[in-house]
Design a protein with these regions (language model features):
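Bacterial N-terminal signal peptides
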Residues: 8-14
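Extracellular carbohydrate-recognition regions
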Residues: 21-43
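Extracellular beta-strand elements of beta-rich domains used
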Residues: 29, 190, 208-212
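Short carbohydrate-recognition loop motifs
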Residues: 50-70
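Solvent-exposed strand-to-loop "edge" motifs in beta-rich extracellular domains
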Residues: 88-94, 117-119, 173
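Extracellular/luminal beta-rich ligand-recognition
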Residues: 105-150
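Extracellular beta-strand ligand-recognition surfaces/modules
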Residues: 107-112, 148-149, 155-158, 162-202
Length: 215
């Protein structure tokens, strides 16, 4: 599921985060931050979000059954200084058997969007949708069945890691050129989403330590 989440609802994310030259932490997953996060457009209901912590710090747990919604921030990230997104995440219950590049199966147990504003309206936004796939191999990518302005890119898969914490990294600047054919110097925001409104299945996932780095 994507529909117009990035294209039309990202403008509702009006929160900002601290930025420095070496590292940009996007989400702290604290009680204070959670109270201020904006929920994006809801699809047949809202994902349940629960804060928690472990030996490596704070995380947020997402649960969705036949529904979906996202949390996001508008933050200007200089990709010439910090082009790499780093994500630590885990999928406890995946969406086995769905066809993720179809409208009926376009759900993900975990996904992280990076968004670039490329025009004067929200409809012109471009996005890369980094996903924790339930059915595809790492490195696979395809346009969203709802809009070609968002590309799904598999960074993790439950075929290799189910109910296991995984840390991944991607060069966002290079990925925008490879997937969208555009050279971007910065991005405009980041959002997370767990959704199952198309498949009607249940997903449980966790997000932790999402930040941008120089290398």
């Amino acid at each position: 599921m994507l529909r117009n989440f990035i294209i039309t609802t990202f403008s509702s994310f009006l929160l900002f985060t601290n930025v420095n030259a070496e590292k940009t932490t996007v989400f702290d997953f604290t009680d204070e931050e959670f109270k201020t996060l904006k929920v994006g457009k809801k699809y047949k209901g809202e994902t349940t979000w629960t804060l928690g912590s472990n030996e490596k710090g704070n995380f947020i747990k997402a649960e969705a059954e036949g529904k979906g919604s996202g949390l996001g921030k508008e933050v200007l990230i200089d990709l010439s200084k910090t082009p790499f997104i780093n994500i630590t995440w885990k999928v406890e219950k995946d969406l086995s058997g769905i066809i993720e590049n179809s409208k009926k199966g376009h759900d993900y147990a975990a996904r992280v969007f990076v968004i670039k504003k490329t025009g004067s309206t929200a409809l012109s936004n471009r996005a890369i949708n980094y996903v924790f796939s339930s059915n595809n191999e790492v490195g696979k990518n395809w346009p969203s069945p709802y809009t070609k302005k968002s590309i799904d890119y598999v960074l993790s898969t439950t075929q290799e890691n189910l109910d296991t914490w995984v840390t991944v990294k991607a060069n966002v600047k290079e990925d925008f050129m490879k997937l969208h054919g555009i050279n971007v110097e910065d991005i405009s925001g980041v959002a997370i989403m767990t959704d199952t409104d198309n498949s009607k299945l249940k997903a449980i996932s966790y997000y932790q330590d999402i930040y941008f780095s120089a290398e």
